[in-house]
Swiss-Prot record:
Any single biological process term in GO: translation
SMART domains linked to this entry: KH (SM00322)
Lineage: Bacteria, Bacillati, Actinomycetota, Actinomycetes, Micrococcales
HAMAP family associated with the record: Ribosomal_uS3_B (MF_01309_B)
A molecular function GO annotation: rRNA binding
GO cellular component, one term: cytosolic small ribosomal subunit
Name of the protein this chain belongs to: Small ribosomal subunit protein uS3
Family to which the UniProt record says this protein belongs: Belongs to the universal ribosomal protein uS3 family.
Protein purpose: Binds the lower part of the 30S subunit head. Binds mRNA in the 70S ribosome, positioning it for translation.
Record text on subunit structure and interactions: Part of the 30S ribosomal subunit. Forms a tight complex with proteins S10 and S14.
Protein's organism: Tropheryma whipplei (strain Twist)
PROSITE patterns found in the cross-reference section: KH_TYPE_2 (PS50823), RIBOSOMAL_S3 (PS00548)
Amino acid sequence: MGQKINPYGLRLGITTDHVSHWYSDSTRPGQRYADYVSEDIKIRSYLTKTLDRAGIARIEIERTRDRIRVDIYTARPGIVIGRRGAEADRYRLELEKITSKQVQLNILEVKNPETTARLVAQGIAEQLAARVAFRRAMRKGLQSATSAGVRGIRIRLAGRLGGAEISRSEFYIEGQVPLQTLRASIDYGFYEARTPYGHIGVKVWIYKKPSVRGRTEGGG
């Protein structure tokens, strides 16, 4: 099972935290659980499409009664903030239009993009779109992650690799990636490369350390 599903599915509350922090049992329109889920999807969709080149690692959403806090973790905060914060203000106003609520936007820098699965996947996808050989792009992703000190990394590509007539998948693995060990802190990322031959899916699993709620294996 651990090999087939999204690794976050079984690890929420163990090594992985939720990316949406709110609760609703209201029956009032606009405050129902389904309304909040729909709003979250719209917020994430808008930001990921608009900030495609900003290296977005993850987006966290927290709600109060009449306010939404959105934390954007990015490898390129300058693109999101803009000159004197002009771009950040524009995104915040657009989110307020989408949600009809007051929005607090926080931009946080990702210190180690080489060890963040989604950013590694995006880097490989950008190389594929620039017509770099897929095996070379995969090896570069492996080398940058292992040199940054991760315990293991697995990269899987699927699609018309190298412009082949028939689509196929190929993966490389370096070190340990124990997907069935729930105490293993596994970071997972997915990105699609848009190539002249069609889309190629890029999946990355990064094994950082074994832990349970902040306690490392063998530690006190």
